[in-house]
């Protein structure tokens, strides 16, 4: 189980992110892509955590290498869901994934999302994919 103090910090961060997005005019009725961030020094640990997150119903990105300011090499991936911008829904994901990260020996580094313009035209070609086409795939728009 994740440290309760760390969870409370993450819950406060969730409230802050949502509040800032809505204050900036992001669409309160949109479905958002929520990117939870995992990292680890050991690729195998990260991979095992990613597999477990996938089993829980999340999409998972490929691992990428990141060098910290202290020159430590970390392997990172995003654990992705779609959700309304609601504190309780996102905090339930935060708790689930922070607990998983603790169990698997990886870091849960919070979450992020993107601004959703309420005035943007609906994309009729949208096929509800979480990920855009690969660079070598033809674009439909």
From Swiss-Prot:
Residues 119-141 have a biased composition (Acidic residues). This is Regulator of ribonuclease activity B. Keywords: Cytoplasm. The gene is rraB. InterPro entries: RraB (IPR016716), RraB-like_sf (IPR036701), RraB_dom (IPR009671). Signal peptide: none annotated. One of its GO terms (molecular function) is endoribonuclease inhibitor activity. It is found in: Cytoplasm. Residues 112-141 are annotated as: Disordered. GO terms for cellular component: cytoplasm. Globally modulates RNA abundance by binding to RNase E (Rne) and regulating its endonucleolytic activity. Can modulate Rne action in a substrate-dependent manner by altering the composition of the degradosome. Pfam families: RraB. Interacts with the C-terminal region of Rne. Belongs to the RraB family. Disulfide bonds: none annotated.
